[in-house]
A protein has these predicted regions:
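Membrane-topology segments of multi-pass transport proteins
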Residues: 1-21, 25-33, 40-298
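Transmembrane alpha-helix signature in integral membrane proteins
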Residues: 301-325
């Protein structure tokens, strides 16, 4: 009787339903788990973490100053550090702290990150005037603001420099949006129009209808588009001149002063001086920027908008194609 009941249960298809449901549940759990791991590991990247200014004293070497953001800390065996060639004393705790510091200033130092031994950091401070400058190229710059210049002339320094810098960065970002519209939309439309005229002329030529009147009409349209292009080119030249007008002078950890064109600055902020709610607002603005902006620096910085749009569209199209066969 039990054998017949078991056979009937298998024939009813119920085991397949349970197996399919279990497989779907496992897939959903794995997907949620993967998204959770990505969120925990990745979303913290957008938080404006405090910046440190400290002295790094390696035994037997001249000390040097370190400015940057602590990204990661880990406990490593003393012997491991010693075997790596670091001058670690024989006596001491079994484990030492190793910290990954984002020092930025890649155009000056060659590296964005560096590993240091936490026990060798001394005089660690978080001065509120320490700033992070997110640039369109070469990554972040960490240091202190000295002054703001317009056409090479100092217009603000000291305490007045920071609000002036914020106003100039906002102005540059507005100009960048105008430049993007002109270069991608307006010039793109003109190029498309010129290509349409070329193809239409070729079509008339193949059909034997490219007479003097048709040629005159095509040339008239082409001249109109070229005139529009010259006008846009003049506007672009003017915008580029305004875009490159301002600059800032900053001082790095070692006291070296460098000049940064504000046209190359995306954001400038002082995380040590920001309150909790200010940091939360900045965090969500960075997340939105990541989702909506175009990439830059060979897809290593900026946003992911084109990629995420293509991925979502591909998923939807594949779902519509596959579902009828499912």
């Amino acid at each position: 009787m039990k054998q017949n009941s078991l056979n009937g249960w298998f024939k009813s298809g119920a085991p397949g339903v349970w197996m399919s449901g279990g497989a779907v549940s496992i897939a959903v759990i794995m997907t949620i788990g993967l998204l959770a791991v990505i969120a925990v590991r990745g979303l913290g990247h957008f938080w404006p973490a405090d910046l440190i200014h400290a002295s790094y004293d390696v035994p037997g070497q001249a000390n040097h100053l370190v400015v940057g953001e602590v990204v990661q800390k880990e406990q490593v065996p003393r012997e491991r550090l010693k075997s790596a060639g670091l001058p670690v004393p024989d006596q001491g705790p079994e484990f030492m702290t190793r910290e990954l510091i984002k020092v930025g200033n890649r155009d000056l130092n060659g590296n964005d990150f560096t590993w240091i031994v936490g026990e060798w950091l001394t005089n660690q401070k978080t001065p509120p005037e320490l700033m992070a400058v997110e640039r369109r190229e070469w990554g972040n710059f960490y240091g202190y603001l000295v002054n703001v210049k317009q056409d090479g002339k100092v217009i603000a320094e000291g305490e007045a420099a920071w609000p002036e810098l914020q106003a100039r960065v906002a102005r540059v970002n507005e100009l960048a949006a105008q430049l993007k519209t002109l270069e991608k939309s307006d010039i793109g439309a003109i190029n498309a129009g010129l290509e349409r005229i070329r193809l239409h002329g070729r079509k008339l030529e193949l059909a034997g209808k490219l007479d003097a009147t048709a040629q005159a009409d095509l040339e008239s349209e082409r001249a109109e588009l070229n005139a529009r292009y010259q006008d846009i080119e003049a506007r672009l030249a003017d915008l580029h001149a305004q875009f490159n007008r301002d600059s800032l002078t900053a001082r790095d950890a070692n006291g070296k002063e460098i000049v940064i064109d504000i046209g190359k600055v995306v954001h400038a902020y002082q995380p040590n001086a920001m309150g909790t709610f200010t940091k939360i607002g900045f965090y969500f603005s960075k997340v939105w920027e990541f989702l909506s902006d175009d990439p830059r620096e060979a897809n290593t910085e900026g946003g992911i908008f084109p990629a995420i749009f293509g991925t979502v569209m591909m998923t939807l199209i594949m779902a519509m194609i596959v579902t009828p066969f499912g």
